[in-house]
Swiss-Prot record:
The gene is secG. One of its GO terms (molecular function) is protein-transporting ATPase activity. InterPro entries: SecG (IPR004692). Belongs to the SecG family. It is found in: Cell membrane. This is Probable protein-export membrane protein SecG. One of its GO terms (cellular component) is plasma membrane. It is a multi-pass membrane protein. It comes from Staphylococcus haemolyticus (strain JCSC1435). GO terms for biological process: intracellular protein transmembrane transport; protein secretion; protein transport by the Sec complex. It comes from the Bacteria. The chain crosses the membrane at residues 2-22, 57-77. Involved in protein export. Participates in an early event of protein translocation. Disulfide bonds: none annotated.
Length: 77
């Protein structure tokens, strides 16, 4: 049981890191904050397609991560 939780945790961590790295950046960095940052503030657009899928998958994988960690600590593994 302990090995199963650890393997699931490792798979979830690798998937979570991969999904986060696949997402596009939401800001232009420091240059976007200094000049032209208001465009993002007022021109906020809804996510569509792949961006929306990656965003939702990130949330799902994060919830699974925390559930596995709670399971490991609850069962004292």
């Amino acid at each position: 049981m302990h090995t199963l939780f650890i393997v699931l945790l490792i798979i979830d961590c690798i998937a979570l890191i991969t999904v986060v790295l696949l997402q596009e950046g939401k800001s232009n960095g420091l240059s976007g904050a200094i000049s032209g940052g208001a465009e993002q503030l007022f021109g906020k657009q809804k996510q569509r397609g792949v961006d929306l899928f990656l965003h939702r998958l990130t949330i799902i994988l994060a919830v699974i991560f925390f559930l596995i960690m709670i399971g490991i600590s609850y069962f004292g593994l």
